[in-house]
Amino acid sequence: MLGGMADRPYHHGDLRAALIANAERALAERGPSALSLRELAREAGVSHAAPGRHFKDKQALLDALALTGFDRLTGRLEDALAAVGEDGARTSVLALARTYVGFAIDNAALLDLMYARKHDPRSSAQLSAAMERLLDTVVRPIVDGQSDGEIAGGDPWPVAMTVSAALHGFATLKAAAPPEKVEESLAEVVRVLFEGLAPR
């Protein structure tokens, strides 16, 4: 039976994507320590050796999953900015905040994996680039706010890092809070941030 499984073509069309999707579900349900390439292969209906064509080991799969998370989050942040349009830096940052915190609450295990220290050095460059793309999205309304006088001038990158850190910490603290409380508190956090960032 195993021989037939190994010889038949993959019915998914994209085994790599199927493995990542199954891994994300398993991560959310059981955590990273419970992930098994053999079990994921069984769920995908392929031989236990088949995942090795895409991921040399479990860590490579986890790194790919983290990269997928960064790409998805960045895409959602970009969509949030596009939906706001030219409505001011504070409105843009609040839209980013809602999107980031919503993603963090819905994908807590994935977000933990994305920012985990333990990654294969060969994946670190890709993950660093993915994190930089995310920060590029956050820095955009900061630069606009500086141009419009809402935010003090200077290097926008430390400001973007501060905003990102505040949102990440907020999401961690409020993960189990009722949605209406999260929204109320989030608006207050953004208000306080902009008071601190305003020109003196």
Question: Which residues fall in each region the model found?
Answer:
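N-terminal intrinsically disordered/low-complexity leader segments
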Residues: 1-14
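C-terminal alpha-helix
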Residues: 141, 192-200
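An amphipathic alpha-helix signature
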Residues: 94, 98, 135-139, 143, ...
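Helix-turn-helix
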Residues: 18, 22, 26-60, 64
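Hydrophobic alpha-helical connector segments
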Residues: 64, 78-110, 159-163
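Amphipathic, non-transmembrane alpha-helical scaffold segments
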Residues: 16, 62, 66, 70, ...
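Hydrophobic/aromatic-rich alpha-helical bundle segments in the mid-to-C-terminal region
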Residues: 8, 116, 123-128, 132, ...
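Generic hydrophobic, amphipathic alpha-helix propensity
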Residues: 15-24, 40, 65-69, 73, ...
